[in-house]
Regions:
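Conserved beta-strand elements of beta-rich interaction domains across eukaryotes
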Residues: 57-60, 66-67, 81, 134-136, ...
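Core residues of folded domains in eukaryotic genome-function proteins
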Residues: 48-50, 55-57, 70-78, 123-127, ...
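Catalytic phosphate-donor-binding core of small-molecule kinases
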Residues: 321, 371-382, 516, 547-549, ...
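Generic C-terminus detector
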Residues: 157, 162, 166, 170, ...
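Eukaryotic beta-rich interaction modules
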Residues: 30-46, 53-65, 73-77, 175-181, ...
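Catalytic core of DAGKc-family lipid kinases
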Residues: 207-209, 231-233, 239, 246-247, ...
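ATP/NTP phosphate-donor binding region
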Residues: 2-255, 262, 266, 273
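Non-catalytic interaction/regulatory modules that flank or connect domains
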Residues: 128-132, 531-539, 545-558, 566, ...
Length: 646
């Protein structure tokens, strides 16, 4: 029998943690708070013992082997969830004896406790802990998926072992949620599901497959339930959010490009109860479009790796359950009012954005190809641009904000997980993701079969059984991720219930609500305090996020809620070489001249108006084409809420 946890949980007991100094803790630093501790073993290594401690910092693993000791820690911020499972009953004709030797290639199969397929001869309870650990490299970093398996088998009855496992599960779930009052059974504060809306046409048309293969497994690990809807037509998401009882859900997650986020956002502002809706509901985004500016901005501001696995980065953001306030810009044309979160454009970038739609099938590369085309046949536009400069106090607040989400150091962070030499046989890759649009994707495009996703550390409490060779092979695993698309944690797939025609809940006339404008009428002259530039322009583009797309670092000083619009003006007369340098610099934020330039300038403003003289051209709001003509916009700081990693 192994040592029992130093801190126990009674049936109605709240853990009263005791402070304890972990190895490597500086005497001047506050001690770690230890909630649970237990001794585990690796059955294949007779002399290896792990003391596992759950602290306020994370899951501490102290390895003792042949007289040497090594301590590693998985930070709480990297853990997304855990589940208690038990072994699956063996197929008829196979050995049912729990102490039968398992070959090196055998894989343990686990099921839910009440699935009806459990192996009654195995009294062990298995706790699977899922973490995505930050790894740094010269290119920035990535998150490595690590699964820790704790096998509880100290007692003769499954119920007793499961009670111990559930105690650990509850404590981990509470701490990951940021709560320190821990009870033996986990009861989440929020029981409502997420509303997930997928635009299957976004980007290269693979959003549905990407959600199935890369997002649903992460939601399953975090035990996040959701209702899933597939859009049927343009503005479907907008109509759905406007008409439905959205308070049935605790948040909205859109899967697609920036366009579907724009739809959902404006659907909220078309509700009579818009103020309550934006106060209570947070919106998140999984980037499957061509641009993905907001998702990239969030990852950039919170120092999260994005380029290698953007969908994973955003899925982890969703499961963290955190949010930030988000500036929203009210935009007005001659016939329409809308609310924007990303940008307003006139000229070169808008031309590229709209005219490259014919190349949508090639994904984000369409922007590069059309940029070259537009640079060769450059257009200019006559008109007038007016703006309200941002106050100095706003500028100081913006530039003095610390860079959010810097990853702090720590003693003994888990550098490498201990893994059995087993490989994932990814069903999604073998079958081409179900024969859909992603059928020809290579293994390099599938998160499931990435080698960084196969790390497993398996530990067990003591007994006379040394036969455990763990390998998860259930609907939680990569080999059966197709089922998670429909069944993850009581989630519901709803798309076939919606009508193929009309609005999701019957037609009604849309009216835009939201905060009223504080600007002069669009037909009236601008007020005192506005500055005006009259002339010929190559482009005018206003942005309030750092990135307009994954590789367009447009406004490096921007924050999610700084109350500033960054207005870029490029006047006619700029040389093609200067424009080429500008376009090339957009990828790393070096596009703005470091010295005064008469043709290119970036101005921080709180409102602006564009008045074209001609009648032909493109104007865009959040990448969507809008009526060409006079347009004005003003920022409303911190009006909405968006999901963020921390």
């Amino acid at each position: 029998m192994v040592d029992k946890p130093k801190i126990g949980l009674g049936s109605e007991e709240i853990v009263n943690p005791s402070p304890a100094l972990s190895k490597g803790t500086d005497c001047g630093s506050p001690p770690h708070v230890v909630y649970l501790t237990e001794t585990f073993y690796i059955s294949s290594k007779k002399n290896t013992v792990f003391e596992v401690r759950l602290t306020d910092k994370g899951l501490s693993l102290k390895k003792q082997s042949n007289g040497s000791t090594k301590e590693q820690t998985i930070p709480l911020k990297d853990i997304i969830g855990c589940r208690c499972l038990r072994s699956k009953r063996k197929a008829k004709g196979s050995s049912a004896c729990a102490c039968t030797s398992i070959s090196g290639t055998a894989q343990l199969k686990v099921v839910e406790e009440n699935s009806g397929e459990q192996d009654e001869s195995d009294v062990s309870a298995y706790l699977y802990i899922y973490a995505y650990i930050m790894k740094r490299n010269r290119r920035g970093g990535f998150r490595e998926r690590t699964t820790i398996t704790l096998r509880f088998r100290s007692f003769d009855k499954y119920e007793d072992n499961n009670k111990e496992a559930q105690k650990w599960r509850a404590a981990i779930k509470y701490l990951v949620a940021g709560e320190t009052s821990i009870r033996p059974t986990y009861q989440p504060k929020e029981t409502r599901k997420l509303l997930v809306i997928i635009n299957p046409k976004s980007g290269s048309g693979k959003a549905r497959e990407m959600f199935q293969q890369r997002v649903a497994p992460v939601l399953a690990e975090a035990e996040i339930s959701y209702d899933l809807h597939i859009t049927k037509k343009s503005d479907w998401a907008r109509e759905f959010v406007r008409n439905r009882d959205i308070y049935l859900w605790r948040g909205i997650v859109v899967v697609g490009g920036d366009g579907i986020f724009y739809e959902a956002l404006n659907g909220l502002f078309e509700r009579e109860d818009w103020q309550t809706a934006i106060d209570e509901l947070t919106i998140g985004i999984i980037p499957c479009g061509s641009g993905n500016g907001l998702a990239k901005t969030i990852a950039h501001l919170y120092d999260e790796p994005f380029e290698t696995k953007p969908i994973l980065a955003s899925a982890l953001t969703i499961v963290k359950g955190k949010h930030s306030l988000l500036d929203i810009v009210r935009v007005e044309t001659r016939s329409k009012i809308m609310f924007s979160f990303l940008s307003v454009g006139w000229g070169l970038i808008s031309d590229i954005d709209i005219e490259s739609e014919r190349l949508r099938a090639i994904g984000g590369q369409r922007f590069t190809l059309w940029s070259v085309h537009r640079l060769i046949s450059l257009r200019t536009y006559q008109g007038k641009v007016s703006y309200v400069p941002a106050l100095v106090s706003n500028m100081n607040r913006s530039n003095s904000l610390p860079h959010e989400g810097g990853v702090g150091g720590g003693v003994g962070l888990l550098k490498h997980s201990i893994s059995y030499n087993t490989t994932l046989d990814c069903h999604d890759c073998r079958t081409g993701g179900g024969g859909g649009a992603g059928a020809n994707d290579s293994h390099s495009n599938c998160d499931a079969c990435d080698t960084n996703f196969s790390d497993v550390l398996s530990l067990e409490t003591g007994s006379n059984l040394d036969t455990f060779r763990p390998r998860i092979d259930s609907w939680y695993s990569a080999t059966s991720r197709k089922s998670t698309y429909f069944s993850t944690v009581d989630s519901i797939y709803e798309s076939d219930r919606a009508s193929n025609e009309g609005t999701p809940n019957g037609a009604n006339v849309a009216q835009m609500y939201g905060p009223p404008s504080r600007l002069p009428a669009l037909t009236a002259p601008v007020s005192d305090g506005w500055k005006t530039i009259d002339g010929e322009f190559v482009m005018v583009h206003a942005a309030y996020q750092t990135h307009l797309s994954t590789d367009c670092f447009f406004a490096p000083l921007s924050k999610l809620n700084d109350g500033i619009i960054w207005l870029l003006i490029i006047k006619a007369g700029v040389s093609r070489s200067q424009l080429l340098s500008f376009l090339l610099g957009l990828s790393n934020g070096s596009h703005i001249p470091t010295q005064a330039n008469r043709y290119i300038q970036m101005i921080p403003v709180t409102a602006f108006r564009i008045e074209p003289s001609g009648s032909s051209g493109h104007m865009t709001v959040d990448g969507e084409n809008v009526e060409y003509g006079p347009i004005q916009a003003e920022i409303f700081p911190s009006l909405a809420k968006v999901m963020v990693p921390k």
